[in-house]
Amino acid sequence: MTEFQLPKLDFAPDALAPAMSAETIEYHYGKHHASYVANLNALLKGSAFEGKSLEEIICGAEGGLFNNAAQHFNHSFFWKCLTPNGGGRPEGALLAAIEKTWGSFDAFVAAFSKSAAGNFGS
């Protein structure tokens, strides 16, 4: 059986500081995400989902198998969304839509930050 793997980070653990510390990255990546991958691989052995893609597992499994597969997917996506230099200010149609809705990019950032701080999830 091919096992799922913890993806390689595209940045050093300290590259996101001060927004996210190396300690936070190492804990979240090296402990949380690594545990989801290990649990997923253990739960797959002998199951009907052994050998299936991550997407097939997420769409068909339940309980712990679903939870660990979904967390592996979510975290893998999360790491790809992070970059040491940030995304910067958008341009073109996206910036126009932001300015139309929020009045300015800075107002959007403030509203987004406030909303994000009030939510919990992974």
Regions found by a protein language model. Give the residues of each.
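Feature for soluble, non-membrane regions of globular proteins
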Residues: 1-122
